[in-house]
């Protein structure tokens, strides 16, 4: 965790610079992040196809380029997600049929958890420590790659709750959100997977 603290400090510093940008500029920043990833991946794909004959090696090179782009964007993307959380404070919306007021500004420990998850590690957290909010950061970052992100929960209630609750953050960042329930028709499930 000590190795991650300088990155958290950078994220918090970048977040302060975002206080005066418009909501439209937030969406534009998300698009810029996507563009960086697409360019990096396309360049790696072209290079891999020209220089590598092994398909597995080509895929590795392309995924490595995507991973490197995501790591490069991580501080700015996490800062942007934190800014959206701050802006939502005081807002209310319906979550599983109940009006819910947003009052969450991510703590450093939640940002640390997001970094740990993004890097493919397990982050153990106790009840009430903000696991749902922690997931916002790596979900947003990895969704920028355009391949979709799936979060698995233990039951239908949590799937719907978390999609509706955190969905406002994702939407303000320019993402779409869907969720799957056991009772859904296959066509509806299919459209939500996209």
Regions found by a protein language model. Give the residues of each.
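Conserved SF1/SF2 helicase motif Ia
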Residues: 119-129, 134-164, 172-173, 180
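Conserved pre-motif I regulatory segment
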Residues: 1-129, 133-140
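Short, exposed beta-strand "edge-strand" segments with a Pro/Gly-rich flavor and a Y/T-containing core
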Residues: 14-21, 151, 179-184
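Hydrophobic/aromatic ligand-binding patch that stacks against planar heteroaromatic rings
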Residues: 114-116, 141-142, 169, 192
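Conserved motor-coupling elements within RecA-like helicase/translocase cores
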Residues: 167-194
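Solvent-exposed, charged/polar functional surfaces in cytosolic regulatory/catalytic domains
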Residues: 80, 84, 165, 172
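Short functional linear motifs
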Residues: 23-26, 163, 189
């Amino acid at each position: 965790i000590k190795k991650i603290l300088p990155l958290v400090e950078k994220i918090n510093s970048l977040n302060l610079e975002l206080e005066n940008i418009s909501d439209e500029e937030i969406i534009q920043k998300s698009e810029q992040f996507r563009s960086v990833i697409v360019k990096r991946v396309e360049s790696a794909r072209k290079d891999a196809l020209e220089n590598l004959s092994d398909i597995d090696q080509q895929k590795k090179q392309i995924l490595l380029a995507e991973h490197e782009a995501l790591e490069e964007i991580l501080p700015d993307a996490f800062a942007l997600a934190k800014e959206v959380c701050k802006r939502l404070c005081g807002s209310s919306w319906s979550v599983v049929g109940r009006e819910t007021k947003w009052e969450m500004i991510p703590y450093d420990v939640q940002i640390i958890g997001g970094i740990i998850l993004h890097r493919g590690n397990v982050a153990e957290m106790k009840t009430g420590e903000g696991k749902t909010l922690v997931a916002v950061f790596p979900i947003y970052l990895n969704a920028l790659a355009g391949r979709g992100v799936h979060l698995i929960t233990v039951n239908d209630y949590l799937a719907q709750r978390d999609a509706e609750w955190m969905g406002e953050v994702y939407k303000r960042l320019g993402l779409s959100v869907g969720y799957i329930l056991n009772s859904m028709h296959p066509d509806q499930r299919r459209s939500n997977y996209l």
